[in-house]
Curated annotation (Swiss-Prot):
GO MF annotations, alphabetized: DNA binding
Reported function: Negative regulator of class I heat shock genes (grpE-dnaK-dnaJ and groELS operons). Prevents heat-shock induction of these operons.
Family: Belongs to the HrcA family.
Database matches in Pfam families: HrcA
The protein's name in its UniProt record: Heat-inducible transcription repressor HrcA
Lineage per the UniProt record: Bacteria, Pseudomonadati, Nitrospirota, Thermodesulfovibrionia, Thermodesulfovibrionales
Family annotation (NCBIfam families): hrcA (TIGR00331)
HAMAP family from the UniProt entry: HrcA (MF_00081)
UniProt keywords, alphabetically: Repressor, Stress response, Transcription, Transcription regulation
Length: 348
């Protein structure tokens, strides 16, 4: 049975079950629903509706005599219902959280590491879930300065600073004959010709130059340009995670083994990057629930994510990771508001 095939009463019962379970992680009974939500039918009718919802895969019954709990399918219905009904209204408390965050971010705008650390910590503090932020991909940022430092005969440290103030170091292999003086000249060439251009633009131009030099100039120039190209290639690896302390106290993670599993998952940078790869950087908040996640290790969680930008250019993503039994209305509003606040800070 699809959501669109549910009648209005059934939808209201399903919404009530999910909302009740989010508020209190105990199986929900028909009598409780009837009293709390004031349904004008008897508890037996509600029980029959809940039984039909179980058959349709929206609810499950942990014990024969117990009430029902939502499945991933029920949480998806609940989230879609929230969006369709536009059940979003910022409370005074949420407005204060955003105002305080905006003030803090303005003070930190010249220190990207502190900026994103503050964002994830504040997001986690406000929700009691894990706050995550994927920093801007190096390719999307503009070059501020590059320096080359000879480390060993055939090794050079490339120090790349982008327009966001993020510093990247990389060790690259070079031909042994190159001197520090030549490296300084090379850095001057890059800084003079490519300052303010994105790393992608620089690499594209270097590829063209390398092809030309192979035809017209000597191999030495080609090698130098290849070294520049390698120096400007970085894998995307900067992910900030805050709030493990908060989820430790959620009843959803009271099992010590489950908590260890969570800790192992969020410490795996490869998995975190894989998670972000599956979140498109469009204009909308995205909610991924349990089994919907293509990354198997995250199927015990729900993810709420939103892109942040600099003006109209998407730079990265911020996200919440929490239990499927999540306060979706509040979490969606906060993630959306945090992303907008970060965008304003980066765009001003």
């Amino acid at each position: 049975m699809r959501d669109t095939m549910l009648d209005e009463r059934t939808k209201k019962v399903l919404y009530a079950v999910v909302e009740s379970y989010i508020e209190k992680p105990e199986p929900v009974g028909s009598r409780y629903i009837m009293k709390k939500y004031g349904f004008d039918v008897c508890s037996a009718t509600i029980r029959n509706i809940m039984s039909d919802l179980e058959d349709a895969g929206f609810l499950s019954q942990p014990h024969t005599s117990a009430g029902r709990v939502p499945t991933d399918k029920a949480y998806r219905f609940y989230v879609d219902y929230i969006f369709q009904s536009e059940l979003f209204s910022q409370s005074l408390e949420i407005k204060r959280v955003i105002e305080n965050l905006t003030k803090k971010l303005r003070k930190l705008r010249n220190n990207m590491n502190s900026l994103f650390l503050e964002t994830t910590q504040s997001l986690s503090q406000a929700t009691r879930y894990l706050g995550l932020a994927l920093l801007p991909a190096t390719e999307k940022t503009a070059l501020h300065r590059v320096d080359f430092i000879k480390f060993k005969d055939d090794l050079v440290i490339a120090v790349v600073v982008n327009d966001k103030g993020i510093v990247k170091n990389k060790i690259i292999k070079v031909y042994p004959e190159i001197t520090q003086k030549e490296l300084n000249s090379l850095a001057d060439f890059v800084n003079r010709n490519y300052h303010g251009k994105t790393i992608d633009e620089i690499r594209d131009d270097l590829i063209v130059r390398i092809k030309k030099e192979k035809i017209f100039w000597d191999r030495l120039i080609s090698k130098i340009l290849k070294m520049c190209q390698e120096a400007l290639y970085f894998s995307r690896e900067d992910v900030y995670v805050s709030g493990f302390y908060h989820i430790m106290h959620l009843p959803d993670f009271s099992d010590i083994e489950k908590l260890r599993e969570v800790a192992k998952t969020i410490q795996d940078r490869h998995l975190l990057l894989k998670l972000f790869e599956n979140i498109s950087e469009d204009d909308e908040v995205k909610v991924i629930i349990g089994q919907e996640n293509p990354v198997e290790e995250f199927r015990s969680f729900s993810i709420i994510a939103s892109p942040y930008k600099e003006k109209d250019k998407s730079l990265g993503v911020i996200a919440l990771v929490g239990p499927k039994r999540m306060n979706y209305q509040r979490a969606i509003m906060l993630v959306n508001a945090f992303a907008r606040s970060l965008t304003r800070t980066l765009s001003d």
